[in-house]
Amino acid sequence: MALRFTLTLLLVTILVAAILLGSSEAAYRKPPFNGSIFGKRNSLDYDSAKMSAVCEVAMEACPMWFPQNDSK
């Protein structure tokens, strides 16, 4: 009887531990790689060029899509 109780308690303990470890693993996130081997890349140089290209396209396209009536 004591052996059966001990085995049941051991099985329940293992199941609870497996459930708790599974839920704690879901919260873990690996840090981003960021090119630590090859050096870090600076995206600030590219951001201004991309933004100016987007603004240029918007300034050309918006007047065609939304014409302004200057009859004020």
UniProtKB/Swiss-Prot annotation:
The modification Phenylalanine amide is found at F38. Keywords: Amidation, Behavior, Glycoprotein, Neuropeptide, Secreted, Signal. Residues 42-72 form a propeptide. One of its GO terms (biological process) is negative regulation of female receptivity. Its main location: secreted. Glycans are attached at N34. Residues 1-26 form the signal peptide. Disruption phenotype: RNAi-mediated knockdown in SIFa-expressing neurons causes normal male sexual activity towards virgin females but also vigorous courtship directed at other males and also leads to female hyper-receptivity with a dramatic decrease in copulation time. It also causes reduced sleep and shortened sleep bout length. One of its GO terms (molecular function) is hormone activity. Belongs to the FARP (FMRFamide related peptide) family. Ligand for the neuropeptide SIFamide receptor. Modulates sexual behavior by negatively regulating female receptivity to male courtship and by playing a role in male sex discrimination. Also involved in promoting sleep. This is Neuropeptide SIFamide. The gene is SIFa.
